[in-house]
């Protein structure tokens, strides 16, 4: 079957199509209804079927390949490497599942995971899946304020963390950040389970904090039966940035997620059991959830958990891993590759990369120079793909397992099966023609594996994603165009979310952080193009006192203070690249901030129609501030 036929069947006969794909995983109880779309836009997949992500990732491989590699944990920071076969991983996951139960974690309870990229983090997520607990991973780069907001939203009974992580030789004190977060949160977890790596001192709260290693010793050899979950029960909550400043908890199911990932590993990524998949992301992001934690194991592949930078201790660290473990498929973000471009290609080419068949890049638009450099340096195909936290797996790609069409530089490919993608005119809602810019939307129902709803807020789910046009379609909030051959090109965000090195950040979140500085009267944050990171945040601040406008030393001092504040409240990846001080900001006469206009000026583009602006002189201030 050609990819075109495969795709059309998924759109025209979705129930039959996905019922066939569901055979890729084990079901303890068969589903009675493939799709329930009786309450749109909500979609329920594989109704009344019972399955389990942990069983499909580990247990079902115990008979076929118990001694095959399953998990490879590498830290270039501590120079530690650990490997687990499927049998060994099964033992460890059972022990941690027993530990969780001993701490009172039950089916449906939330477990918040705030950990570095170590084996225990991955094992904890699989243990949650085993017993039917809902895991919610918070990216290790988030500061206490952001962690506290997620604690209050998810209300976990247990938090699993560590003393510290490391990045580029710098210690990140997870426990200290977590203690600060818990002190700020209204919700209080019953227990905090802590992995002590010996990297940083940590204070322990009596009666609440539990040592991971000591408890594990008590549960070695335990066997915990799989909790067979109805397909539409919740597997995880993963927070993504929103324009309101309050992060959205993307809620995902069990059966649909497993089927979507298993199908994607075969058809999109061409993964084969017994081979090794290296996704150089973080489990705190959706790419890590899907293609570090679950998808490779669902396909019987080994997966790599990597702690460190692509350049630490040197620019060959990734390629040493590829060579040593015979990695066949690799997944990263363009930003990481742009960093590597600064180093001599000889440092990469000195490694034996003959096992590597393809490199996948996602998280931000892939530019032509980066794609060409990778392809020439590694001598492998480079496959872009486009998706979101909400989708859980690629919306667009080239399905290497089915499709032999060539890649097209600058394009993430064509719509994937299950996604009825349209480009709509933002004003009329009418479909766009070839090479006409429009908003990229998906007709409902969304395919398996996608967002079920926003955790605890169905109304926000409908209002945010399904209410932009006169008819209900899922809005991606990305601009796109389609060429005559069906290739799509992503042109950027339509909302106030920016993409910094593959990390989505709400400009409102950064603005709220900056606004909390006592010297700030008003602020506007926009994302601007950056050669290395794709986008960076920049801030324009109206200070309460005029000395920041008149004295460069004062302005520099205030800029440093504001950056430090954002670091502490959001994390250093949210830090603005620049903070400029102005006496007024461009707004419409109704008071709406003209962020797109500010962004255009920052990027040297035509700001467009300015008929609604209240005071054109405010634009001159933006220009002058940038020139100083």
From Swiss-Prot:
InterPro entries listed in its UniProt record: ACAS_N, AMP-bd_C, AMP-bd_C_sf, AMP-binding_CS, AMP-dep_synth/lig_dom, ANL_N_sf, Propion_PrpE
PROSITE patterns found in the cross-reference section: AMP_BINDING
Listed pathway(s): Organic acid metabolism; propanoate degradation
Swiss-Prot/TrEMBL keywords: ATP-binding, Ligase, Nucleotide-binding
GO biological process: propionate catabolic process, 2-methylcitrate cycle
Keyword match ATP-binding: yes
Single GO molecular function: ATP binding
EC number: 6.2.1.17
Gene3D superfamilies (UniProt xref): 3.30.300.30, N-terminal domain of ligase-like
Pfam families recorded: ACAS_N, AMP-binding, AMP-binding_C
Phylogenetic classification of the source organism: Bacteria, Pseudomonadati, Pseudomonadota, Gammaproteobacteria, Enterobacterales
Catalyzed reactions: propanoate + ATP + CoA = propanoyl-CoA + AMP + diphosphate
Protein name (Swiss-Prot/TrEMBL): Propionate--CoA ligase
Domain of life: Bacteria
């Amino acid at each position: 079957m050609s990819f075109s036929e495969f795709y059309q069947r998924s759109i025209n006969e979705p129930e039959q199509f996905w019922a066939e794909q569901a055979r890729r995983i084990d079901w303890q109880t068969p589903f009675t209804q493939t799709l329930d779309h009786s309450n749109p836009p909500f979609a329920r997949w594989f109704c009344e079927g019972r399955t389990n992500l942990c069983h499909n990732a580990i247990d079902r491989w115990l008979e076929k390949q118990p001694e095959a590699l399953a998990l490879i944990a590498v830290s270039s920071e501590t120079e530690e490497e650990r490997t687990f076969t499927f049998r060994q991983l099964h033992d460890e996951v059972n022990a941690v599942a027993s530990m969780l139960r001993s701490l009172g974690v039950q089916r449906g309870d939330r477990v918040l995971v705030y950990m570095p990229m170590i084996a225990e983090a991955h094992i904890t997520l699989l243990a949650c899946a085993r017993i039917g607990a809902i895991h919610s991973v918070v990216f290790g780069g988030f500061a206490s304020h952001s962690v506290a907001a997620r604690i209050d939203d998810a209300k976990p009974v247990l938090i699993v963390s560590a003393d510290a992580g490391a990045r580029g030789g710098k210690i990140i004190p997870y426990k200290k950040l977590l203690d600060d977060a818990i002190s700020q949160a209204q919700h209080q977890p019953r227990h905090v389970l802590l992995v002590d790596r010996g990297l940083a001192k940590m204070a322990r709260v009596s009666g609440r904090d539990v040592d991971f290693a000591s408890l594990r010793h008590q549960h070695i050899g335990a066997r915990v039966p799989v909790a067979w979950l109805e397909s539409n029960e919740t597997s995880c909550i993963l927070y993504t940035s929103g324009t309101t400043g309050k992060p959205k908890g993307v809620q995902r199911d069990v059966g649909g997620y497993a089927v979507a990932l298993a199908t994607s590993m075969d058809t999109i990524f061409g993964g084969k059991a017994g081979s090794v998949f290296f996704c150089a992301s973080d489990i705190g992001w959706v790419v890590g959830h899907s293609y570090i934690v679950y998808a490779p194991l669902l396909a019987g592949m080994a997966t790599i958990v990597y702690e460190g930078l692509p350049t630490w201790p040197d620019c060959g660290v990734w390629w040493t891993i590829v060579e040593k473990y015979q990695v066949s498929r690799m997944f990263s973000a363009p930003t990481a590759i742009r960093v590597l471009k600064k180093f001599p290609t000889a440092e990469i080419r000195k490694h034996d990369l003959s096992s590597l068949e393809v490199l996948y890049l996602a998280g931000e638009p892939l530019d032509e120079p980066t794609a060409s450099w990778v392809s020439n340096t590694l001598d492998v195909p480079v496959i872009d793909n486009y998706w979101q936290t909400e989708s859980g797996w690629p919306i667009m790609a080239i399905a290497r397992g089915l499709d032999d069409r060539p890649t097209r530089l600058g394009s993430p490919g064509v719509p994937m099966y299950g996604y009825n993608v349209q480009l709509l005119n933002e004003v009329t809602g009418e479909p766009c023609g070839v090479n006409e810019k429009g908003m990229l939307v998906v007709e409902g129902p969304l395919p398996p594996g996608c967002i079920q709803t926003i955790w605890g807020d169905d109304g926000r789910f409908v209002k945010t994603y399904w209410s932009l046009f006169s008819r209900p379609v899922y809005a991606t909030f990305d601009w796109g165009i389609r060429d005559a051959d069906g290739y799509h090109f992503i042109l950027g965000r339509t909302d106030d979310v920016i993409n910094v090195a593959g990390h989505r950040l709400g400009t409102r979140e950064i603005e709220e952080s900056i606004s909390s500085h006592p010297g700030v009267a008003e602020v506007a944050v926009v994302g601007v193009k950056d050669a290395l990171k794709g986008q960076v945040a920049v801030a324009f601040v109206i200070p309460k006192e005029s000395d920041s406008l008149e004295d460069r030393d004062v302005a520099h001092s205030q800029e440093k203070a504001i950056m430090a504040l954002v670091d502490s409240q959001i994390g250093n990846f949210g830090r603005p690249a620049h903070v400029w001080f102005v006496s007024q900001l461009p707004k419409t006469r109704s008071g709406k901030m003209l962020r797109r206009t500010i962004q255009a000026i920052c990027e040297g583009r035509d700001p467009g129609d300015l008929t609604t602006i209240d005071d054109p002189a405010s634009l001159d201030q933006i220009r002058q501030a940038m020139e100083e």
